[in-house]
Curated annotation (Swiss-Prot):
It comes from Caenorhabditis elegans. The keyword RNA-binding applies. GO terms for cellular component: cytoplasm; cytoplasmic exosome (RNase complex); nuclear exosome (RNase complex); nucleolus; nucleoplasm; nucleus. CDD domains: KH-I_Rrp4_eukar, S1_Rrp4. Residues 175-213 form the KH domain. The gene is exos-2. Ubiquitously expressed. Belongs to the RRP4 family. This is Exosome complex component RRP4 homolog. InterPro entries: Exosome_cplx_N_dom, Exosome_RNA_bind1/RRP40/RRP4, KH_dom_type_1, KH_dom_type_1_sf, NA-bd_OB-fold, RRP4_S1.
Length: 303
């Protein structure tokens, strides 16, 4: 028995089954499983990564999405470790302080490196780092602290080189971190968002979403949530933070792509429910279906 699940990474495959009848072109978003035929005309294509030839046809060896590059067919796995690219915005956790660099966990195969020379020191200094700065590295960033950084370079072994030489990057405090599969993060030109609810969100390309209050005296674009002194967060702001975090988890649990539009749509449609109800299966499944339907409608209108 063979079956085919269609749908872009925008929503979960099981939702797309009931919505794909009106779609005409579904080849580019076809999801395959091991042993499943990749294409209908194998003689016109060459096999690539994640495929093999069986009885004259190209068959998938992985569970993932079919990708085509000219005449080359490949299968890209849906769930995989984060593989960074230059320019990616990531939310990382410092795991070790070494000589002239910090080791950071970015949910990749290897820990990323943050060199001392690639850090903007407190006060906004762009000066040359000296021995005194190296001795104070553990004061700048400690083990377990969260940072927002940008991928500057990808080395030959896959190690990511980070930098925070910009005011919008740096240490993160007073917020909520939600981990999601990296493939659910939709790439965009902007990953720093100030929401109209008095919140700010950093959607990291590595699958880490940071929710923090947008403080009135500063903006996220100006200081990147550099908080050197803890400030009192009002109860209503905390409730909003928890609701946004619950919305991110709902999108994650139902495999809906996470970006600004999907997050704001989920937040607005969740208003009739209490926050604790968003974790209940009946409420969350019904809400996820409505969110997916609206996002699909908006996508079709854009086309």
């Amino acid at each position: 028995m063979s079956f085919e699940v269609t749908g872009p990474p925008l929503v979960s495959p099981w939702m797309m089954l009931s919505m794909s009848e009106a779609r005409n072109d579904i080849d580019e978003t076809k999801i395959v499983i091991p042993g499943h035929s990749v294409c209908d005309a194998p003689q016109q294509f060459m096999r690539g990564h994640g495929t093999y030839v069986r009885d004259g046809e190209i068959v998938s060896s992985l569970s993932g999405v079919v990708q085509q590059l000219n005449r080359l067919l490949m299968v890209k796995t849906i769930k995989q470790r984060y593989a960074g690219e230059v320019g990616d915005v990531v939310v990382a956790r410092v795991v070790e302080v070494q000589a002239k660099r910090w080791k950071c966990d970015v949910a990749s195969r290897l820990h990323a490196n943050l060199p001392l020379g690639s850090v903007l020191l407190p006060g906004g200094d762009f000066r040359r780092k000296d021995v005194e700065d190296e001795e104070k590295m553990s004061e700048f960033l400690k083990n377990g602290e969260l940072i927002c950084a940008e991928v500057q370079q990808v080395q030959h072994d896959g190690t990511l080189m980070l930098h925070t030489r910009n005011n919008k990057y740096g240490k993160l405090q007073q917020g909520i971190l939600i981990k999601v599969p990296p493939h659910l993060i939709k790439k965009s030109k902007k990953h720093f968002h100030t929401l109209p609810y008095g919140m700010a969100v950093i959607i990291g390309c590595n699958g880490s979403v940071w929710v923090t209050p947008s403080l009135p005296e500063t903006t996220l674009e100006e200081d990147g949530s550099h908080v050197h002194e803890f400030q009192i967060v009002p109860p209503d702001v905390r409730v909003t933070m928890v609701r946004i975090a619950a919305c991110v988890r709902l999108l994650r649990d139902y495999s809906i792509s996470i970006y600004l539009n999907s997050l704001t749509t989920c937040y607005e449609m969740s208003q009739p429910y209490e926050i604790k109800e968003l974790a209940e299966q009946d409420t969350s499944s019904r809400l996820a279906y409505l969110i997916a339907a609206r996002l699909l409608q908006e996508l079709q209108q854009q086309k």
